[in-house]
Regions:
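Short connector loops at helix/strand junctions that flank enzyme active sites
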Residues: 50, 82, 89-91, 111
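A generic local structural motif
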Residues: 17-21, 40-43, 81-83, 100-104, ...
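Glycine-rich phosphate-binding loop signature in dinucleotide/nucleotide-binding domains
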Residues: 23-27, 89, 109-110
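N-terminal active-site segment of His-dependent metallophosphoesterases
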Residues: 1-48, 52, 62-76, 82, ...
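Residue-level detector of beta-strand face positions
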Residues: 86-88, 125
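Conserved beta-sheet core of the metallophosphoesterase superfamily
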Residues: 54, 93-95, 99-161
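Ligand-binding grooves and catalytic loops that recognize ribose/phosphate and carbohydrate rings
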Residues: 55, 59-85, 129-135, 142-143, ...
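Active-site metal-binding loops of divalent metal-dependent hydrolases
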Residues: 7-10, 35-37, 58-61, 99-100, ...
Length: 164
């Protein structure tokens, strides 16, 4: 199963559209968003994606009430999990959080095939035992290189996608 992984949109809609287009083109029917919509506008754009998008909140999400309203009333494919999520795909457990401090701790437990996080705006991949800890970088492009990732549940590996 191919999962689209992305984080830190910060209202950068052009790069968000690129990421969603790549996910659709490459066959990722389920996406994981590691936080920081910022305003509710990206939630509307993400809601147009045909598949499920599992989302956690980040520190930059100012109007969580409006984002939740959009998800619950207008775009039920947006699955809001609060500050963190524990998901299962094809018999494997995955954890999602915005914050790297918590992600590293979760990855260290040995309970997850992979843990996904954001916040730093810096792409990183680390193996902690058998667990892959992935920060897909930032959709925003604030640090210069907008990226997202495609994660393969069979191989436990990620392909980094440059959105520039």
């Amino acid at each position: 199963m191919l999962l689209g992984i992305f984080s830190d949109v910060h209202d950068q809609l052009q790069n968000l559209q690129r990421a969603l287009g790549v996910f659709k083109q490459r066959g990722a029917a389920t996406l994981i968003f590691c936080g920081d919509f910022c305003s509710p506008i990206p939630a509307r754009v993400m809601g147009a994606f045909a598949g499920e998008i599992h989302c956690v909140f980040g520190n930059g999400d100012g109007d969580r009430f409006q984002i939740a309203r959009i998800a619950h009333h207008d775009h039920p494919n947006l699955k809001l999990h609060g500050e963190h999520a524990e998901l299962e795909f094809e018999g494997h457990k995955f954890a999602v959080t915005h914050y790297p401090f918590y992600a590293k701790a979760l990855a260290s437990t040995g309970q997850y095939r992979a843990v996904f996080s954001g916040h730093t705006h810096v792409l990183s991949e680390e193996r902690i035992g058998a667990c892959l800890w992935l920060n897909p970088g930032e959709v925003m492009g604030w640090k210069g290189r907008p990226t997202c990732a495609l994660y393969d549940t069979h191989t436990n590996a990620a392909e980094i996608i440059d959105l520039a």
